[in-house]
Amino acid sequence: MQRMFVATVLGLGLALPAHADVTLKQTTGGKGLGISGNASGATYIKGNKMRSDAVMGDKTHTTIFDVDAQKMYIFDSKKKEADVWDMATFGAELSKTVDMSGAKASVKPNGQTKQIAAHSAAGYDMEVAMQSAMGGSKDMTMTATLSGPIWIVKNAPGSADYARFYKAAVEKGWIFSDPRGAKAQPGQAKAMAEMYKQIAEIGGIPYETIVQIKMGGSGPMAGLLARMGNVTMTTTVDAVEITPLADDLFAPPAGYKLNQKK
């Protein structure tokens, strides 16, 4: 479920005015490690805030990213409480386990195009590899590799705001997955963040993203990590809307209990 949750954050949008509120509606699917079927969802961007909703059965899972306040909120529609993460502190701790000097990232045009949601999308081949230490030990390392095709619609409504948000977040060391999962797989979390940064720099919206995640490593955990690989996540944009969004959409509902996490 965490992997499906991560996938729903795969974004979408380019701007007409200098600053616009963007709503991105998408469908997410995947296979591997318990992932099956599709989930509908929406991503909302307002300045340096983003909200991601993923509908799974009769429950909606929500993550709110408030970059300026350095807070991440995670909650669902059933449980009237939200987990709150201080991302300045969490990001600093996570960075200690990830070897950024050995990171490899590339998003290159492949010369292909296709129609998605009535837009012409240009094809790119993406590959990001990130190494991290397991349990703080340099003798046991884990490498997360993300690869696959991305189909980007340049100059689509909402793109500038999409890019602005992700650039601001990555500059502050943010990740875009559940921090609990990121603790176990920091390299994967950082690789995903680097992927968003690379996409944002192209200047368009990824209307379709097919990401294959492979894990590798050294030491006694190498075999287990290899079996954790071959997870594929697909996100497709169904629609992009440029409409004003209320400020309270980017905070837990009134009355929710807030649980501070570390």
Language-model regions: role of each:
Residues L14-A20:
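Sec/Tat signal peptide C-region and signal peptidase I cleavage site
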Residues M1-T8:
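Bacterial N-terminal signal peptides that target proteins for export
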Residues A20-K262:
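Extended soluble regions of mature proteins
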